[in-house]
Amino acid sequence: PNPSPMSRKQAFQFLDLPRTMPTRIPVELRTSGDWGELYGKFDKAEAQYQSGRCLDCGNPYCSWKCPVHNAIPQWLQLVQENRIEEAAALCHSTNPLPEVCGRVCPQDRLCEGSCTLEEFGAVTIGAVEKYIVDTAFKMGWRPDLGNVHPTGHRVAVIGAGPAGLACADRLARAGIEAVVYDRYEQIGGLLQFGIPSFKLDKSVIGKRREILEGLGGRV
């Protein structure tokens, strides 16, 4: 049977909701000493607008193509409902560095490139992920390990690059104290010294250090 006018409208509503990106900082500002991140951030309305474009596919290719299999449709739904802290917790459950991936991950070849809407303009997944974590941190949210029981074990992690930080995060979630060693005072490795500030502001890495120490890790 032919679909009703209402169901047809709902099925194709994404055609009326175009893909949008955060504001790109003007060249004039970027060449006058502002070496901050190239793109701004979504506000609440923009993040909810983009999240609302998600079709909630039965077989979400965005999650499948994501190397860490983020629960993307689920946290997009939480953003629509303004449940930011829950969205941040869900992001952290699969990804120890979501604030980094929201900025520098090649979404066009991974989650966004696999979005069912890609032909019409994929959901701006990376920008929403950045919004979730930055907003949650600003609200004072931190990962909750209240249900984790300390094992009394301590593990040394050599290198405070992305892999070392991710390892320390997962150890903390298993109740193991991680002590991270690095030759440099600043943590981050490639994130700190290899990725320019216009892609990844270094304050983001400083915040990750604070989070790690809050989880009981030491650097």
Q: Which residues does each PLM region occupy?
A:
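Glycine-rich FAD pyrophosphate-binding loop
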Residues: 176-192
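Ferredoxin-type iron-sulfur electron-transfer modules and their immediate structural context
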Residues: 1-154
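Residue-level detector of alpha-helix initiation sites
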Residues: 96, 161-162, 186
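N-terminal Rossmann-like FAD-binding beta1-loop-alpha1 element of flavoenzymes
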Residues: 153-179
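N-terminal Rossmann-like dinucleotide/flavin-binding domain of flavoprotein oxidoreductases
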Residues: 88-98, 128, 191-219
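N-terminal export/assembly segments and adjacent metallocofactor-ligating motifs
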Residues: 138, 166, 176, 201, ...
